[in-house]
Amino acid sequence: MNICFLDNTNFEYNSQDIYSYKLRGAETVLINLSKELSNLGHKITVINNCYKNEIIDDISWKKIQSYDEKETFDLAISNGDTSLFDKINSNKKILFSHSLQTFEKFIRKKQIFSYFKHKPKIVFLSDYHINNTSKITSLFGHIRVNLGIDE
């Protein structure tokens, strides 16, 4: 499967920064998940604010600022931003939600139109996220993963 990760942090990183102080949980999850999916034989591309276009451990890291390839992926996973799906073509789209996605937040971050355009399933990290986020985020389905403890 050809899988793409999309992230638009305001700092540069790639998988060699896995133990860096600058990484937060979302970036660490992206690195670890991309490595494990690559180990399972999937073709992985990470489009983010990396230092330069390069291949590290069979994973393609591409600078988001200059990415314009419009490659088609089987699956695209965006790290908290639906507008990043505009950069690629994908058969399936998943939005990783690391925080509460309120309707107001979708509007404030100018993601409401891209959410309806791309219709991603949203990955929630806990029942708390599912129960305390806008119901609009479940229009196209959601997935709950057990990365933490609910209680």
Regions found by a protein language model. Name each.
Residues 1-48:
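N-terminal subdomain of nucleotide-sugar transferases
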Residues 3, 36-43, 54-71:
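Conserved nucleotide-sugar phosphate-binding/catalytic loop shared by glycosyltransferases and other
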Residues 4, 66-83, 94-96:
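Short N-terminal targeting/anchoring amphipathic segment
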Residues 52-58, 68-72, 83-90, 131-137:
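Short loop/helix-cap segments at secondary-structure boundaries that form the rim of catalytic
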Residues 78, 124-125:
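Short beta-strand scaffold positions
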Residues 87-103:
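A short, gly/pro- and small-residue-rich
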Residues 100-122, 129:
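Membrane-proximal helix-turn-helix segments that form the acceptor-binding/catalytic region
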Residues 128, 148:
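Carbohydrate-associated surface elements
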